[in-house]
Amino acid sequence: MASLRKTHPLLKIVNDALVDLPTPINISTWWNFGSLLGLCLIAQILTGLFLAMHYTADIATAFSSVAHICRDVNYGWLIRNFHANGASFFFICLYLHVGRGLYYGSYLYKETWNIGVVLLLLVMMTAFVGYVLPWGQMSFWGATVITNLLSAVPYVGNTLVQWIWGGFSVDNATLTRFFAFHFLFPFIIAAMVILHLLFLHETGSSNPTGISSNADKIPFHPYFTYKDLFGFVILLLALSVLALFSPNLLGDPDNFIPANPLVTPPHIKPEWYFLFAYAILRSIPNKLGGVLALLASILILMVVPLLHTSKQRGLMFRPLTQILFWTLVADVAILTWIGGMPVEHPFITVGQVASVLYFALFLIFIPATGWAENKALKWN
C-alpha cells in the first residue's frame, strides 16, 4: 500500500515539493537562499502579527505605541528587534538569491524569474510602508519624499499623490492606509511564493554547471532538508546576534525623534537596502528622469533573459563575464555607499558614473561579452 504522503491530495503536493522532489546532486550553498527567504517571510509574518496586536495606527499614538511595545509588552523589545532586523536579513537573502540567479543563468526559467522580480518589488513596497509605521522623523520624511516622487507623473501626478496621501500632506489617513498595506502585502507575497515554486517545479532547479542534471538527481529529503536546516540555524544565529547585541546598528538615529512636519532632518535617506536605488534616483537632475531610472534599476532584471547572448547558461566557465558580474556587484556596493552620502562633490559624480555603469553592464557589456565568448569558442 502506498504511503499516505503519496496518496492524500494535500500531502501529495507537500511531498512533491519537499520530500520526493528530484534535486540536482551538485547544487551549492547558493541554492539555500530560497528556503532562507521562506524562513524570513514566516518569521516576519509571525513577529509582525504580534506587533500588530499592540500597535496603534494613529499619528497621535503610533510612536508611543512602539515605545510601549518595547518597554511594557512581554518580550516586546525582542519581537520588535527581530522584526526590524529580520527585514535587513530578508533583503540580504533576496539580493544574494537574485545574484545567484544572475550568475548561474537561473533567469532562463522566464516565468519563475519574472514572478521573482514581482516578488522583489512587493517586498520592497512592504518594507517601505513598514518603515513609515513607527512615525519617527525618518519615517515621516521618507514617506513624504518617496510618495512625492509620483507627482512627476505627467498630467495626473499631483492628483495621484494626494490620492495616496488621503489629503494634502502625509497625515493620519496616510499612516492608517500604510498600516493596512503593510498587513496585507505579506499574504500576497506568500501567495506569489507558491506560484514562484509552482513554476520552478515545472522545470526543476538549475545547477552550477548550467547543463542538464536529469541523469544525476537525488530526493530532496533527507539530503537538502538537512542542508536547508543548517542554513536556518546559521541565519537565526546571525539574526539573534544582531537583534540582541546591536539592534539599532542598521537603523537611523533620527527615527528615535517623533515625526515633526516642521523640522526636516539634515539627510533624508531610506534604510540601507534601498540606498543603491536611491543613489540612482538622485544621480539624475530631472525629477521624472530620476523616477524612471529608479523603476528601471529594478525592472531591468525582467529584460535580463532577453539579453542573454551566450550559448552557455551560467558563468561557471565564462571568465570574462565573471569579471563583469563582480564589477556589477562592486558597482551596487558603491551605489549603496553613495546613497547614504550627502549630495555634494565628489559623491554626485561618483553616483552618476556608477549609475551609468549599472545600466551599461546589463544592457551592453554583459550581452556583448557573451557574444564575444561564443565567437572565441567558434559557437556562433
From Swiss-Prot:
Keywords: Electron transport, Heme, Iron, Membrane, Metal-binding, Mitochondrion, Mitochondrion inner membrane, Respiratory chain, Transmembrane, Transmembrane helix, Transport, Ubiquinone. A ubiquinone binds at H201. The chain crosses the membrane at residues 33-53, 77-98, 113-133, 178-198, 226-246, 288-308, 320-340, 347-367. Its cofactor is heme b. GO terms for biological process: mitochondrial electron transport, ubiquinol to cytochrome c. It is a multi-pass membrane protein. GO terms for cellular component: mitochondrial inner membrane; respiratory chain complex III. It comes from the Eukaryota. Its main location: mitochondrion. Component of the ubiquinol-cytochrome c reductase complex (complex III or cytochrome b-c1 complex) that is part of the mitochondrial respiratory chain. The b-c1 complex mediates electron transfer from ubiquinol to cytochrome c. Contributes to the generation of a proton gradient across the mitochondrial membrane that is then used for ATP synthesis. One of its GO terms (molecular function) is metal ion binding. It is found in: Mitochondrion inner membrane. Heme 1 (or BL or b562) is low-potential and absorbs at about 562 nm, and heme 2 (or BH or b566) is high-potential and absorbs at about 566 nm. The cytochrome bc1 complex contains 3 respiratory subunits (MT-CYB, CYC1 and UQCRFS1), 2 core proteins (UQCRC1 and UQCRC2) and probably 6 low-molecular weight proteins. Heme b b562 binds at H83, H182. Binds 2 heme b groups non-covalently. SUPFAM superfamilies: a domain/subunit of cytochrome bc1 complex (Ubiquinol-cytochrome c reductase), Transmembrane di-heme cytochromes. Heme b b566 binds at H97, H196. This is Cytochrome b. Belongs to the cytochrome b family.
